[in-house]
């Protein structure tokens, strides 16, 4: 198969199969191709020029066909496609090469096209504009200019609205508010979550109706020791470093109060018989005075008895000592 026929077949193949990729924008892939051309030995200059034309035309074809889709790719997808293509390119020249250098080059370029197409189709289906709500400026590469820029992703839902959540909690408990969405990680630059509160039960769109609570880098906040006065509508806004609101989430919080304490049942006692005006546990006034007087008399009487007993005991002791003294005197006289 002559070189012109191979080249014509390659151009027809590239035109019939759309290559949805930005292969020509990856500098590493360009280096791979340049290194390949510089290491080819034993061919004529004309053949080397033809190989260079095959690669250059592939770049042109990639650029033109990428416009048929979105025309953009993100850094992660480009890295995955490049890594797989590099591996296949090296393996091809070690294991699958034939006697025709031109045919081998066409084969590996076509294989690279399928690899790149596979990765880009996944990106278009899952990675491009993943936000189902809100506003996202996604960083992607333009496959025509090979320059990075911000791709505007508008959701089909009303502007910025990203859902409403109904929460219930008992008074004194805590509740967690979290408005994080997976696509928030794709926002370029610094972001902040703005939480505010409105006491009403319905969502209010005007900023002036909301009381600012906290501005934080974290997507969630914790409300501790809830009281009934804290129920209402909570709003979470994600803002970028320019202050542009990108998503808006509402939380309707209902706080259930503590169960009311039942009043203690008062037991009504039956009426006392006639003549008893006081409670059963109190003595009548006259009886109380009588008992008090009686106790006083008994106390005084007991005290007098004790005093008299002590007085007589002391008197007997003194008389006993007197008798002992006289007896001792008589004994001394008799002795003399």
Swiss-Prot record:
Tissue: Expressed in sperm.
Localization (cell): Cell membrane; Cytoplasmic vesicle, Secretory vesicle, Acrosome membrane
A GO-annotated cellular component: acrosomal membrane
Biological process, per Gene Ontology: fusion of sperm to egg plasma membrane involved in single fertilization; heterotypic cell-cell adhesion; sperm-egg recognition
Domain Ig-like C2-type, first and last residues per copy: 158-247
CDD domains named among the record's database cross-references: Ig
GO molecular function annotations of the record: protein binding involved in heterotypic cell-cell adhesion; signaling receptor binding
Keywords: Cell membrane, Cytoplasmic vesicle, Disulfide bond, Fertilization, Immunoglobulin domain, Membrane, Signal, Transmembrane, Transmembrane helix
Annotated transmembrane regions: 287-307
Domain of life assignment: Eukaryota
Subunit-level organization: Forms a complex with tmem81 and spaca6 on spermatocyte cell membrane. The complex binds to oocyte protein bncr.
Misc note: Izumo is the name of a Japanese shrine to marriage.
Protein name: Izumo sperm-egg fusion protein 1
